[in-house]
């Protein structure tokens, strides 16, 4: 087997283990074997494990077989090939593990056009800044689809705003699809394909994870009253980014990239700012795995479940403690902001979209 085969198997086993599969012991053994073969393909070395080098980009099935001979699923994959960009950001402390995330994105059924990594030299929030000479960064740049972008440090907004700024800078703007991902999550091979296929059916924001906002007295209710996401397009759905979200650039306006207000209202809650922008543009969202928001173990696996690693995140450091109060405060500020700016709140949009 090739290194890429072991990598794909490793990701599949990790997903099964995270989902609590009944054969957990055997799966854990298989994970160990895959990791050993990634490090030592011949299985002969007794040396301590070292980090595997990036796998080569998968060869598109369309280059090896005539379209007429492919299955329906394979024809769909060919048609979707290269139709979107993947966008993410990271901080200095996450770089040592990021190669695993990037490798999972290189093992997709449907390859993206490119994977944009937006990083910054200057510190902000948890990020101490990244040096261009960082050896982990140099390793990441060996991946064929990676494109490193040095940008101003706006925290979590870096995964979406630089891409939209570039898009809106064109004199003739075209519709572009892009997927935002997190820097600590391993994405299964069907990840991008499922997002794209769902988008083509429903023409809306598509997420694997999210919450459904609830109205009380014509206002957005307090966070504890919110439900799990709805698995159909709804204005009530608020996608949350960990397991990936697909957007079209036409879901946004140029106002979105003016970040002073966003950072003032929701400096670490980019999911809220994005929802308010898309919602007020009349764009619903669908959540494909509603229970993912109830536990990290119900969604895609992360690179490290240790308390030390998971604790070093914006959510844990800024949003987790008294998260309800912080979320509710951000919602109130956003509602007042958009009502003053546009004369309409998101609650009104949600209410109008509900069946009579």
Label each residue range with its predicted role:
Residues 172-184:
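Short beta-strand-to-loop acidic/aromatic patch adjacent to the donor-nucleotide binding site
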Residues 64-65, 77-82, 97, 101, ...:
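C-terminal catalytic/acceptor-binding lobe
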Residues 101-113, 121-124, 139:
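Short, acidic, metal-binding catalytic loop of nucleotide-sugar glycosyltransferases
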Residues 120-175:
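Active-site-proximal specificity loops/subdomain of glycosyltransferases
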């Amino acid at each position: 087997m090739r290194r890429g085969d072991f990598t794909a198997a490793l990701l599949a086993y990790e997903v099964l283990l995270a989902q609590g599969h009944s054969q957990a012991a055997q799966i854990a053994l298989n994970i160990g074997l895959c990791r050993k073969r990634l490090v030592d393909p011949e299985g002969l070395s007794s040396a301590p494990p070292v980090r595997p080098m990036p796998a080569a980009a998968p060869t598109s099935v369309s280059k090896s077989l005539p379209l007429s001979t492919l299955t329906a699923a394979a024809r769909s994959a060919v048609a979707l090939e290269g139709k979107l960009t993947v966008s993410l950001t990271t901080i200095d402390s996450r770089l040592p593990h990021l190669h695993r995330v990037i490798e999972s994105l290189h093992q997709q059924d449907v390859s993206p056009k490119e994977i944009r990594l937006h990083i910054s030299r200057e510190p902000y929030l948890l990020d101490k800044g990244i040096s261009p000479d960082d050896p982990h960064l140099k390793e990441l740049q060996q991946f064929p689809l990676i494109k490193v972008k040095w940008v101003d440090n706006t925290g979590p907004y870096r995964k979406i705003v630089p891409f939209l700024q570039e898009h809106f800078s064109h004199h003739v703007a075209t519709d572009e699809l892009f997927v935002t991902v997190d820097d600590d999550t391993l994405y299964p091979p069907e990840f991008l394909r499922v997002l794209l296929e769902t988008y083509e059916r429903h023409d809306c924001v598509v997420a694997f994870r999210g919450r459904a906002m609830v109205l009380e007295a014509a206002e957005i209710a307090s966070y504890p009253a919110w439900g799990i996401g709805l698995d159909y397009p709804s204005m009530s759905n608020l996608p949350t980014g960990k397991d990936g979200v697909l957007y079209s650039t036409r879901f946004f306006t140029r106002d979105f990239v003016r970040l002073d207000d966003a950072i003032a209202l929701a400096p670490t809650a980019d999911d809220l700012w994005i929802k308010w922008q898309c919602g007020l543009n009349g764009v619903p969202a669908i959540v494909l795995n509603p229970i993912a928001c109830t536990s990290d173990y119900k969604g895609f696996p992360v690179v490290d479940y240790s308390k030390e690693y998971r604790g070093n995140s914006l959510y844990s450091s800024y949003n987790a403690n008294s998260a309800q109060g912080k979320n509710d405060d951000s919602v109130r500020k956003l509602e007042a902001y958009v009502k003053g700016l546009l004369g309409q709140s998101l609650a009104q949009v949600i209410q109008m979209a509900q069946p009579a």
